[in-house]
Amino acid sequence: MMDISLKRITSDNYEEISLLEVEEYQEDYIASNMWSLVEAAYNENYVVRGIYLLDKPVGFFMWVKENPHKIAIWRFMIDKIHQNKGLGRNALQIALNEIKKDKEIKEIEICYNPLNPVAKTFYASLGFEEIGMDKDGDDMLALIRVTQ
């Protein structure tokens, strides 16, 4: 079992999280961590977590409670040097478990670029079901219905 954990982002670790990067071809699929941290600082329903392997930062999450019963994962990334090692799968499972601790939550949503070749298979393998494109027609929406 990998020693993966999610940690709150504070004044002590925001810089190391903001320095994480995806591969160049992935940059169109996700906002920078720095921008996400700025958004979270000014929006109280935004939750940010650093993904750590042992004590080393390897990725980032941001999710938003869009209403009392729904959380949307808006950002999820693994640093380019740590991709394809199973870290993302483990981290997402930990994040889903943390989100499900809120007993009001009935839906967990994620969106992704439908042209992203890996996303559909990856998210489906963790229980997300595609429900169609977002209202702008840009991103595929996928959902986990939570049964508590």
Regions found by a protein language model. Name each.
Residues I99-C111:
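Conserved GNAT acetyl-CoA-binding A-motif
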